[in-house]
């Protein structure tokens, strides 16, 4: 066995947790690598960012060396570059050392030929002859934007079923963000299609407090598991929001377990349900990867008392008016150059840190006002701030959290102007 060496501790790779659900013979690492948040570098010439391939290779090498074998990507991740980057990194390893998952992300074009081309491009980008886990990406919208329009009316589901039969897709499933009606409809097709897995957003906040049109994770999990379908978990940390939490909630978690990270609570919650096959984490930095390996080497399942403790924590978090942005960047690029996730992430950070001036009578007003405005300018260049939103709405259909993005940008911009004019 290869020893797993982590900063400040040492554990054996044999202790890591795997899941297996017959008749599927795959032995899948409970920690899966989400490839939506690969590290980036400033692009030559200063126009945006490019993926840091050298660092991606280092992260993938470390992950595989330490037992991670499930890698999840999509044609739309990192503005279209994730699949290629993931393929470059994985190609350097034996094919039997990893399972790769990708998706049909045909949000903007439901044409049959477009979907087939996207599928074949994924094989090419990933440099593989078959895809282990293939998903109908982000079901949940009604009508033409959902299952019916994107996969049934155009014959694409029939095409994918034939690809599964031919062995070029080993397991076929779908990921979900949306309405209960669309979820129930997709799941009801299991008897005729035989879904091999379903990917849902599951964390201790969304268990009973899903935002927007999304469905509570307790319902999603119970329904999928009742049909004996393995569950792949996405957003166990809500795009990092469950590690960037208000100070008193942070203290609440640390007091309960001083040795563990705040993130480890979320990963234990996501990994405890027995029908979970793997838990995806978009690990941009090595310390994220090492911390998550520590949590799942092996997983210590939550006790009933700990589970209730986290659900109570989620109740407390509902008092904080953050925008439910997970920094997925599906809304990007904005045609007017706005850094949409940058604006929303900064706003949420200030809410959680208490740097949200309420009025000039607040004793912390001056300090909080300065922290918000200076931090905003440092986080988001002026030409990319919310003030440039014209409300075109191009971003809205792409948001898996159903955020009314122009509305939130205009609200934040109005708040910023009030702070600048000191009219709160």
Question: How would you name each of these model-derived features?
Answer:
Residues 56-76:
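Catalytic domains of carbohydrate-active enzymes, especially glycoside hydrolases
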Residues 21, 33, 63, 71, ...:
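Conserved, mostly hydrophobic/aromatic
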Residues 69, 194, 219-424:
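Structured C-terminal cap/extension of enzyme domains
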Residues 70-77, 170-175, 278-280, 399:
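Short catalytic-loop micro-motif centered on adjacent basic/acidic residues
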Residues 42-45, 50, 70-89, 140-145:
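Glycine-rich, proline-tolerant flexible connector loops at the mouths of alpha/beta enzymes
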Residues 1-13:
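Single conserved hydrophobic/aromatic residue that forms the stacking wall/gate
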Residues 41-42, 109-232, 237, 245-250, ...:
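Glycine/proline-rich, positively charged
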Residues 14-34:
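N-terminal amphipathic alpha-helix/helix-capping segment at the start of soluble metabolic enzymes
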């Amino acid at each position: 066995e290869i020893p797993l060496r982590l900063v400040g501790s040492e554990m054996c790779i044999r202790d890591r947790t795997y899941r297996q659900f017959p008749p599927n013979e795959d032995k899948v690492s409970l920690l899966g690598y989400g490839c939506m948040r690969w590290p980036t570098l400033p692009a030559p010439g200063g126009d945006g960012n490019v993926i840091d391939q050298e660092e991606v290779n280092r992260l993938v090498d470390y992950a595989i060396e330490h037992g991670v074998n499930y890698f999840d990507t999509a044609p739309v991740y990192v503005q279209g570059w994730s699949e290629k980057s993931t393929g470059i990194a994985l190609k350097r390893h034996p094919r039997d050392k990893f399972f790769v998952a990708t998706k049909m992300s045909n949000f903007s074009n439901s044409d049959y030929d477009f979907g087939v081309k996207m599928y074949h491009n994924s094989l090419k980008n990933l440099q593989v002859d078959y895809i282990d886990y293939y998903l109908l990406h982000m079901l949940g919208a009604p009508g033409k934007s959902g299952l019916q329009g994107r996969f049934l009316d155009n014959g694409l589901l029939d095409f994918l079923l034939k690809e599964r039969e031919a062995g070029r897709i080993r397991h076929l499933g779908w990921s979900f963000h949306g309405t209960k009606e669309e979820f129930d409809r997709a799941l009801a097709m299991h008897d005729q299609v035989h879904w091999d897995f379903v990917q849902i957003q599951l964390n201790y906040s969304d268990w009973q407090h899903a935002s927007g049109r999304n469905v509570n994770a307790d319902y999603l999990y119970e329904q999928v598991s009742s049909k004996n379908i393995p569950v792949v978990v996405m957003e166990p940390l809500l795009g990092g929001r469950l590690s960037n939490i208000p100070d008193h909630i942070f203290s609440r978690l640390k007091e309960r377990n001083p040795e563990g990270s705040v993130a480890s609570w979320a990963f234990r919650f996501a990994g405890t349900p027995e029908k979970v096959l793997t838990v995806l984490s978009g690990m941009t930095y090595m310390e994220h990867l090492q911390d998550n390996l520590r949590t799942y080497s092996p997983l210590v399942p939550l006790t009933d008392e700990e589970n209730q403790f986290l659900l109570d924590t989620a109740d407390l978090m509902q008092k904080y008016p953050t925008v439910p942005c997970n920094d997925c960047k599906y809304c990007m690029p904005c045609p007017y150059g706005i850094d949409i996730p940058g604006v929303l992430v900064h706003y949420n950070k200030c809410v959680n840190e208490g740097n949200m001036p309420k009025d000039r009578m607040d004793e912390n007003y001056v300090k909080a006002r300065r922290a918000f405005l200076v931090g905003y300018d440092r986080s988001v260049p002026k030409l990319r701030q919310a003030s440039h939103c014209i409300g075109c709405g191009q971003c809205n259909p792409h948001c898996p959290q159903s955020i009314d993005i122009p509305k939130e940008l205009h609200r934040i911009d109005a708040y910023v102007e009030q702070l600048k004019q000191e009219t709160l």
